[in-house]
């Protein structure tokens, strides 16, 4: 008997429907075609054990399985459940009437338990788009998939539940989640707050500007000055995720298998902080079986690279294009995969190997050549892509011992949100542009033209610091953000002055770059 069962294959952060055709006939062999990988081919042994452990008999017949479309590689053990159901239905152990209404995915253990899978959310979205009545998946993934409305999502723990449900012997209750309530439940809660930071008012201001315009930022300063402390508090002043951004971010983490068990929707912007020993593939994604990298896992959030010069040159250079394009394209011989990479890059570094160059109290023991080699690990093109470059100095004792509360993240966030609302109105007619950091040269010429005094100041800075054309654009973008924070319609000289001050690594005292 020929039957069809439906599953899904995840490519990038989206899913494709996979049709699994099973035919049982006279014979004793097991054939599987349709570009399955080794894990899918090995499912035969798992399915036999799971089925017979639960009191059912695996057919002693010739079983032919075809997985289409044949040009899409089927990877992983998540096809165990639809394969098992298809084989039993073909052997008339399961009624085939309901099979066309449901999509099934799940990995089987030898005792028939159904184990978690990756990509439950994009699979659920695809099931709804294709008009399936419901989705049957592992119970551990059910809340993740149930955020998709207008789809019955059933979480199951073992194969017996699935067989009895499809045969009409039991009823299963679909898991229902109020997506909006789930989204708003924790999206304003933060454990870290800028009120914990003593002093460093100028650096806090730089973070406010970065958050308001979506600008990349790098902090240069000695050990213990508070670089990491402030970077970790950046998400607390960023605008909250929209529901659409939350779904997109959750899809990426779902595909990567990074969702916590029982979680549903990511309601806060991600903060990723990879170690400096990370490989280029782990950072940008890829591999034999392509997966999102850290830069994609930080999409719609913050990617923090602590001690930037300690990262390998290859890792830093491979990051340049994604920062510009806000996406990662992984090309293979027969297909290509695209992952989003819309991140705010926050980096920190010491000014020299010993850490005390330009320190007000401690003496630097590094030679000028050593300092230049250290700074030379970060290329000019990469620095050009970092809009705000801030030098940070140690906090004096008087500030550390001050018990008066500092400004909270909430009050800073209100100003950031107000500036973002101005930008949202400005770019309403420009799809794909949401904040000042994303402006093209054409938009800069329309929205960020400085006044006469500002233009003169900018010309002086370009000549003095030998800035590139890209750095020129970055200064204008930052100046436009500063003007938005002040509610100014035009870009004025004081906005240009502050923006130029955020190009510390272009200054003469950091050497010619």
Predicted regions and their residues:
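Basic, amphipathic alpha-helical bundle interface domains used for macromolecular binding and assembly
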Residues: 39-44, 59, 66-76, 289-290, ...
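Residues immediately C-terminal
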Residues: 110, 303-304, 310-311
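Conserved alpha-helical scaffold flanking the Walker A/P-loop in AAA+ ATPase domains
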Residues: 208, 265, 270, 280-303, ...
């Amino acid at each position: 008997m020929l039957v069809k069962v439906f599953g899904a294959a995840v490519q990038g952060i989206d899913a494709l429907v996979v049709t699994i055709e099973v035919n049982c006939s006279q014979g004793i062999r097991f054939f599987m075609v349709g570009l399955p990988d080794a894990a899918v081919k090995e499912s035969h042994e798992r399915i036999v054990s799971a089925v017979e452990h639960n009191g059912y008999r695996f057919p002693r017949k010739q079983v032919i399985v075809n997985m289409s479309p044949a040009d899409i590689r089927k990877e992983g053990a998540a096809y165990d459940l639809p394969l098992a159901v298809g084989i039993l239905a073909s052997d008339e152990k399961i009624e085939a009437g309901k099979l066309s209404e449901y999509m099934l995915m799940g990995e089987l253990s030898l005792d028939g338990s159904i184990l978690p899978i990756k990509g439950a959310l994009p699979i659920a979205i695809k099931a709804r788009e294709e008009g399936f009545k419901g989705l049957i998946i592992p119970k551990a993934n059910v809340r993740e998939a149930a955020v998709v409305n207008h789809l019955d999502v059933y979480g199951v723990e073992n194969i017996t539940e699935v067989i009895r449900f499809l045969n009409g012997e039991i009823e299963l209750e679909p898991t229902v989640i109020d997506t909006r309530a789930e989204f708003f439940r924790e999206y304003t809660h933060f454990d870290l707050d800028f009120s914990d930071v003593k002093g460093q008012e100028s650096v806090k201001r730089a973070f406010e500007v970065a958050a308001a315009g979506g600008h990349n930022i790098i902090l240069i300063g000695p050990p213990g000055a508070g670089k990491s402390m402030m970077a970790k508090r950046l998400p607390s002043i960023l605008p909250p995720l929209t529901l659409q951004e939350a779904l997109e971010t959750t899809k990426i983490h779902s595909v990567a298998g990074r969702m916590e068990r029982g979680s549903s929707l990511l309601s806060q912007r991600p903060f990723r902080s990879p170690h400096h020993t990370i490989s280029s593939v782990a950072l940008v994604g890829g591999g034999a079986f392509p997966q999102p990298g850290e830069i994609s896992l930080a999409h719609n959030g913050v990617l923090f690279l602590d001690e930037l010069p300690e990262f390998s040159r290859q890792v830093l250079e491979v990051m340049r294009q994604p920062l510009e394009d806000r996406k990662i394209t992984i090309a293979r011989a027969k297909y290509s995969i695209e992952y989003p990479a819309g991140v705010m890059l926050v980096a920190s570094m010491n000014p020299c190997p010993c850490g005390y160059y330009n320190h007000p109290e401690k003496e630097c023991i590094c030679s000028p050549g050593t300092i230049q080699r250290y700074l030379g690990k970060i290329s000019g093109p990469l620095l050009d892509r970092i809009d705000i470059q801030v030098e940070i100095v140690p906090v004096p004792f008087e500030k550390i011992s001050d018990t008066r509360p500092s400004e909270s993240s909430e009050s800073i966030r209100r100003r950031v949100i107000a500036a973002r609302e101005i930008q949202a109105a400005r770019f309403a007619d420009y799809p794909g542009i949401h904040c000042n950091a994303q402006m093209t040269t054409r938009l800069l010429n329309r929205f960020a033209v400085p006044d006469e005094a500002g233009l003169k100041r900018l010309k002086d800075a370009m000549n003095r610091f030998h800035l590139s054309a890209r750095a020129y654009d970055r200064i204008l973008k930052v100046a436009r953000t500063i003007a938005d924070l002040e509610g100014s319609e035009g870009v004025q000289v004081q906005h240009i002055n502050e923006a130029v001050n955020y190009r510390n690594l272009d200054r003469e005292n950091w050497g010619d770059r």
